[in-house]
Amino acid sequence: MGYTIKQKIGICLKAEANPEMTQSDLALWAMKEYNSERPPSQTTISRILNSKNDIISRKESEFELIRRRKRANPLLRRILTEWITQANWEGIPITTPIIQSTANAIWTRLPKEGQEGNGIFNQKWCSHFVKKLNINITGSPRDVLDNRGYNLNKVWKLDEILELKRYLRDIIDQEDYAPQDVFVIDDFQLFYSLPLDQIFDVSSIDKGIKQSNSSAEHSLTIMLGCNIDGSEKLTPIIVGKYDKFDVSKSTHVSLNSMQFDSVSYQTLMNKLTEVYNIFYKSNTNKWITSSMFQNYLTRLDHKLSNSRPNGRKILIILDDCSSHRIINLKFNNIRLCYLKNEANHKNPYNTTYSGIKFDYLPMNFGIVEEFKILYRLQQYLEMINLQRSKSQIDSDPMIEENLTSTSVATTATALEVLSESDYHISLIRAIEWITRSWHSVSSERIFSSWKKTHLFNLLDWPSGNSGQLVYLNQKLNTFDENKSLKKLKEVMSYLNVVIPWEIDELVGLVNERGKVTLSYASIEEIIDSCLSEPVDDYDEMGDDDGRFDNRKNELGDVSSVPVDNSNDPWFTVSEINEFHNDPFYNNDKSIDAAAEPLESISPDNDSSAIPGLETKALSAISGLGTTSTSVVSDSPSGTTQKYNNISTYPNGSLKHKLGVLENWNRKRGPGQGQGQGQELQNPQGQQQQEQQQQQQHQMSGYNFSPISNIESPIASGGLTNPNVQFGNGAGSFDNQTPLFMNSLTSPPPPPPVPVPVPVPVPSVPSQVPATSFPQDVSSSRAVRAPMSTAAVDVDMATAITKLLEYSASNTLKLSQSTIDDLDYNLRVIRARLNQR
């Protein structure tokens, strides 16, 4: 017998709730559950599970279908559905002649391969099409009554805050929502392959100018969601430009061995969802369309029905951008609350657009910013290690001439400035970083963001059950909100660049803050957003007989796949020790000791996202000390510095101009350069660290079990299975160091250091007693004598002259503003040299 869509959904949900069941077990369960004469074949079960993401998102109107007929013009139907959805939300009247005219206009704009028929659509076709859409935006009278007298598509404006707070309190009390049942959803752009050196053309991203095709290719739209206490995070949606892409650089063995061009789109997407617990979609504009969002919520609604005996009901707060305007707001287990986004600009690319969002979405009060900081931190660590691997350890003769016998004999290492192509990040690597960053956002950060909205009285929850919120509120007393920002700022100083980013600009890029889907979308925009998106032609496979095997119900038993860490950038300390055979990486030294002072800022913050990534940053910084004591870059902007104030920069707003020489040279004085790190001996801590590393190596996949928020309902009704490895947020990475050693060649041994003559500034001892701890990260670095002023000027003038020569010969592409800045700096330096 054939199975209906509803029965197939039941099979998929049963498989996800019981991952230990084999396909033969599922077949026997289906026969008993649905009173079949015989169990379905192995081929049938396999096909159902292979299309489970598509099947679970089916609407109720399709529940009784067994086979769905292949329909004509699937692309036109998708575009017309998007247009009708937007028109209904905007209150535009829709009649049959208007639908006929719009359908014909869409048909003429489609590429030839997407056109079917003659482009003429009669009244019967239009009537049947609208009926199948099942439009329900405002809700029935009963739905309005249950919604406290408001339409389902009610959008709450900024000046309705008091009425909104009363509505939320009444709804929570009426439906008995716990804090864990209230979620927020928001989407934003991420330029995942952004060059970290502003000498390259990044003005279109930084200043809000409309991007060119080359820069727009390396951006993604990401949708994130979480509840109030941060205990559950919804599965992210990631939308890119390409439906299939190279996955050979994945750190997961089942992906890096896959030939993406030889597998089907469905197989690749299922594997990405299985490994990273994300939904990847694609279209030309990289938009989350309303159809995507409708399917996402429908899938979530079906899983909520299966999470508890009587289902679980949740409330989702979101803004009213066009992506969230769906055609049917009636769900069995989900209630949507729309907030007006006052930053409703038709053209967010306008240079005067500030990107400030006047709303009450918790995502805009620190969650998205924290996510981007954690992503950029991983990007900087990757580039620092790439730069280190490409740089040659050569001494500058001019520096050697100015070094006296009282100076530290270790010369500076000139780190090679990376090219624009070096900053390219593969899409699969970006997905891994996105997943890691989202899982590393702590519950304290999430709760703090909800608290800042003042939408709820979190300590006096209407339906009770506020014990966890009281606990989180107490932990906020020791929670350092700027900890991740400080760490990113410190790590940024170790990347040698020509024109560095300012941290506020990097985290708050205009085109990342602005939504391109805020207002009503035109037909042309809708067509672009639907092109290249895989089209569902509603063609179901039939039942085939076949023999059973005892394969798992997913694409494969991931837990049994061997782990291949050869391409994993997050190597453990012991592996780096073995690779380098360097005194710095001695096994009897603990790399975590340097992080102790920073971690002591928040001793009770066990689930903070920063300790783990912070330790990796410190490890990377200390690792640089093995080959470098201070960086004399090719330009003064690239000189590594450490600033104690987040908002203070050496040159203020004139970041492209040289600061006062005395101030600039003082920052490069003793104790300010990169020095060889001194570590503490802690054999007991090292032994515990190695044991934890062995446990991590036994894990499968990308060194974590993705938080299966909506994937595996559990008996308690939660959307998330307990995840031991991510129990401490990013602290789970404490015993790993993020040095990318895959393409690194072993560095030559450091030059012998003669016994230095005592100098006024004492140097760091080579061995620190185990009972003493450094008070600051910079205290673990060696001391370097300052360079003479003349030597610095000559070095800078030579470097700037070379840059201008490269630009004149088109070897290096520089913007005109950068060339003007370099000319200005060169004139200042030459004038200063002529005065001596």
Curated annotation (Swiss-Prot):
InterPro entries: CenT-Element_Derived, DDE_SF_endonuclease_dom, Homeodomain-like_sf, HTH_CenpB_DNA-bd_dom. It holds the Pfam family DDE_1. Keywords: DNA-binding. Residues 626-732 are annotated as: Disordered. PROSITE patterns: HTH_CENPB (PS51253). Residues 641-651, 699-711 have a biased composition (Polar residues). Residues 626-640, 677-698 have a biased composition (Low complexity). Residues 64-139 form the HTH CENPB-type domain. GO terms for cellular component: nucleus. GO terms for molecular function: DNA binding. Essential for the synthesis of pyruvate decarboxylase. This is Protein PDC2. It comes from Candida albicans.
